[in-house]
Amino acid sequence: SAGFKAGVKDYKLTYYTPDYETKDTDILAAFRVTPQPGVPPEEAGAAVAAESSTGTWTTVWTDGLTNLDRYKGRCYHIEPVAGEETQFIAYVAYPLDLFEEGSVTNMFTSIVGNVFGFKALRALRLEDLRIPVAYVKTFQGPPHGIQVERDKLNKYGRPLLGCTIKPKLGLSAKNYGRAVYECLRGGLDFTKDDENVNSQPFMRWRDRFLFCAEALYKAQAETGEIKGHYLNATAGTCEEMMKRAIFARELGVPIVMHDYLTGGFTANTTLAHYCRDNGLLLHIHRAMHAVIDRQKNHGIHFRVLAKALRMSGGDHIHSGTVVGKLEGEREITLGFVDLLRDDFIEKDRSRGIYFTQDWVSLPGVLPVASGGIHVWHMPALTEIFGDDSVLQFGGGTLGHPWGNAPGAVANRVALEACVQARNEGRXXAREGNEIIREASKWSPELAAACEVWKEIKFEFEAMDTL
C-alpha cells in the first residue's frame, strides 16, 4: 500500500541494539537511568538514545529521506547498578556525523540538550563520555598545557601555590593590588580573582587589572621568581570578555581566568583560542558545577564537564580538594584528575571511569585544589595530587594572624618541606603532621599558622561514593 507506516512505536524496536559493535569513531555515553515505574530499562535506554539523536515521539514522513541506520544513536548495553534496584547504566553510541567539529556546545546540545526532561524517566545522569580520537583532533584543547606552563614559569618538581584574594567583594582596586603583592612577595606563585569578581561598581575591571599588574611586577622584581595573578576576564558578552583579555595581554601579564560554565562553552573556546595565539595561560573556575553535578541520580558528573573543558580549552581547572570544605571523594576525584592530566587513561570503574580515553597528545590541564585547605593539609595534598597541580589557600593564606605575606611564607615553607620529605622517601601522608612540625621549628611564620589551624584529622563521610 502507498504511504508510510505512521503512528507511535516503541523506541526499543529501533534504538535498542544489544548486538551493535561500537566503532572507534563513535562517541560513547554512559547514562545512569532511573525509569518511571512500569517502564522497562530497555525502553528507557532506547528512549535516551532516540531523543538525543535522530528520534522523535512519532514516525515521521521525512524519516524516509534519510539513512536512519547511519545517523541514529543506539543503546547497545544495559547493566543494573549494584545496590540500586531502580537504576541502570545505559550505554549509548552516537555516530560521529551527528556532531559539529570543534564544538563542545554542539556536543552537549545533542547529547544532553533534550532528554533530561523526558517523562518516561524519573531521573537521568550522564556519568561519562568516550570522545573518539577523530573528534578529539578537531579541538585545539588547552592553550598551553602542563609542560609549556612549567617552562614559561620556570617552576619544576613541585605543585604550584595560589591564593584567592578575600574578601571577594568590596575591596577597592588599590587595596586589592596590595593584597596581591603581599601574597606574591611572601612566596606564592599565583593569586586569583574570585569567580564573582568581574567588573562591579566598587572595583571596575580595568583598575583592578592595572593594580594587579603593578603588584606582580613588583613582587617579581623582589623575589626573582615569575609571578601571576588570574585576571578574571569573564563578562556579560563575548566582546567584553575579549576586550579584557586583550588588555591583560597588553599589560604583559602571564595568565587570565574564565568561569567556563556560567560564561558558556562558546565563550570559553573563543577565549582559549585567543590565549594560545597570544601566549596567555588560562585558569578555569567551575562556578555553577554543583548545580549540574551534585545530585547522584540526575545531571552530569563532573568528570564529563572536566573532559569537555580539556576539549574547549583551559590550563588550570578547579577540581575539589579531597580534604577541605568542599565535597569530593578521593578515588573519584583522582579518576577525573587523571582524565585532565594524562594522555591515555584506562577504563577503571573503581574510579568512576567508564571508558578508556585516548587524548592523542592534546595538552593536559593542571587540577586546582581550592577550598578550606591550610598548612596541615599540605602533606595529604602533595601525596594525593602530586607535582602537577595548583594548591590554592585563600583563607589559609589571608587568615594568618600576622598578615598575607607571612601567610604565604607559611604555605611555601610547608610545601617545600613536604616535597623535600617526599624526595627523601618519606611517606608524606603517614608522617605529615611530623613533617610540618619539624619545619615550623625554623619558620616562625609556619609555627604561627600551625597554631591557628591546629592539627587535623581526615575523618568524614564523603557523599560521592560509587
From Swiss-Prot:
Its EC number is 4.1.1.39. The active site is at K166 (proton acceptor), H285 (proton acceptor). The disulfide bond which can form in the large chain dimeric partners within the hexadecamer appears to be associated with oxidative stress and protein turnover. The modification N6,N6,N6-trimethyllysine is found at K5. One of its GO terms (biological process) is reductive pentose-phosphate cycle. GO terms for cellular component: chloroplast. GO terms for molecular function: magnesium ion binding; monooxygenase activity; ribulose-bisphosphate carboxylase activity. The keyword tRNA-binding does not apply. It is an enzyme of class 4 (lyase). The modification N6-carboxylysine is found at K192. It comes from the Eukaryota. The basic functional RuBisCO is composed of a large chain homodimer in a 'head-to-tail' conformation. In form I RuBisCO this homodimer is arranged in a barrel-like tetramer with the small subunits forming a tetrameric 'cap' on each end of the 'barrel'. RuBisCO catalyzes two reactions: the carboxylation of D-ribulose 1,5-bisphosphate, the primary event in carbon dioxide fixation, as well as the oxidative fragmentation of the pentose substrate in the photorespiration process. Both reactions occur simultaneously and in competition at the same active site. This is Ribulose bisphosphate carboxylase large chain. It comes from Adoxa moschatellina (Moschatel). The gene is rbcL.
